[in-house]
Amino acid sequence: MAKLSSVNKNERRKKLVKKYAGRYAKLKAIAADSSLDDGERLIARLKMAEIPRNGNPTRIRNRCELTGRPRAYYRKFRLCRVQLRDLANKGLIPGVVKSSW
């Protein structure tokens, strides 16, 4: 199990990202638009810098739903490899079968 503080910190980050998502996307589009003059783009970048660091979507870490483990994460199942293997062997994940050839 991952430390509860790490899992909670990631949850706080998710809330901040959701809070600033609209503003962040709008400013990012302005900053990337090459048809605008450099002054407007610079202002957009400076406003992006004022958004809290944890409001940036890249700061979110994918974690296992059951254990909170941050590594070896399978997006399709939202589980780490350890839990995926355990649940698949027990037959608790529909459609997942052990391969043999």
Swiss-Prot record:
Annotated TM spans: none
Domain of life where this protein originates: Bacteria
Keyword Ribonucleoprotein annotated: yes
Keywords carried by this UniProt record: Ribonucleoprotein, Ribosomal protein, RNA-binding, rRNA-binding
A biological-process GO annotation: translation
PROSITE patterns per record: RIBOSOMAL_S14
GO cellular component, one term: cytoplasm
One Gene Ontology term of the molecular function aspect: rRNA binding
Repeat as UniProt keyword: no
Family to which the UniProt record says this protein belongs: Belongs to the universal ribosomal protein uS14 family.
Quaternary structure annotation from Swiss-Prot or TrEMBL: Part of the 30S ribosomal subunit. Contacts proteins S3 and S10.
Function: Binds 16S rRNA, required for the assembly of 30S particles and may also be responsible for determining the conformation of the 16S rRNA at the A site.
Protein name (record): Small ribosomal subunit protein uS14
